Regions:
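Ferredoxin-reductase
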Residues: 2-82, 132-134, 157
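FNR/FR-type flavoprotein reductase catalytic core
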Residues: 69-220
Length: 220
């Protein structure tokens, strides 16, 4: 933690039963889609744990969105309250393709965090395909509803009425590729198995690897 910055949590929002978003004053500039490392004092994991920034670069508050998987870091962060402090690194990462092409985000769960930051900051046409257990596990509901992003939400574990962008079951990647502009750039984020599977299916549908950006989450 020698070169870490200390920030104070000023807001805590419970996104769903498993996911919490922590807000703190933005201590530096960053590019949409980047992440920071969070350090826990006294942890055996001295290198810390990386978390994507879920806020936009132009917002006063910076945020990270954490799913509680029962590990040391996620349990600690999801128990934080307003007034607690965090030790963080500066932002890094190159998930953002910095292109003017249409953007297509494909995310599962908290994999939406960096994709939301990029799509919300984009000026070009944007499309989002989001896999969630059910509507109750949706994250960033208010922000997505207020945005101009074309959102397609898939409930994988609970049958829902197919309205307000919701569909049942898992999405078919080949259908996504056929639905979006042919020159689109794809952003894929979620668990490693999810990212690997979606990447393989996008390329199998004829999309060149140079038009795909990926980022995988590891639970801790």
């Amino acid at each position: 933690m020698r070169d870490s910055l200390t920030v104070e949590i000023v807001r805590v929002r419970q996104e769903n039963p498993e996911v919490t978003t922590l807000y703190f004053e933005r201590p530096f500039d960053f590019m949409a889609g980047q992440y920071i490392t969070v350090f826990i004092e006294g942890s055996q994991v001295r290198e810390g744990k990386a978390y994507s920034i879920s806020s936009r670069p132009d917002e006063k508050l910076m945020s990270i969105t954490v799913k509680n998987v029962g590990g040391e870091f996620s349990s600690y962060l999801c128990s934080c309250q307003v007034g607690d402090t965090l030790h963080i690194s500066r932002a890094y990462g190159d998930f953002n393709p910095q292109t003017k092409q249409p953007l297509v985000g494909i995310a599962a769960g908290c994999g939406l965090s960096p994709i939301w930051s990029i799509l919300a900051d984009a000026k070009q046409p944007t499309f989002l395909y989001l896999s969630q257990k059910s509507p109750e596990y949706m994250v960033f509901s208010e922000e997505l509803a207020a945005s101009s992003i074309q959102v397609n939400k898939f409930s994988t574990r609970q049958q829902v009425e197919e309205k307000n962008g919701w569909r049942n079951g898992r999405f078919e990647v080949a259908n996504i590729v056929s639905e979006v502009p042919s020159n689109a750039h794809f952003l894929v984020c979620g668990s490693l198995p999810f990212v690997r599977d979606v990447w393989q299916k996008i390329t199998a549908a004829g999309v060149d690897e140079s038009h795909i950006s990926t980022e995988a989450f590891f639970e801790q």
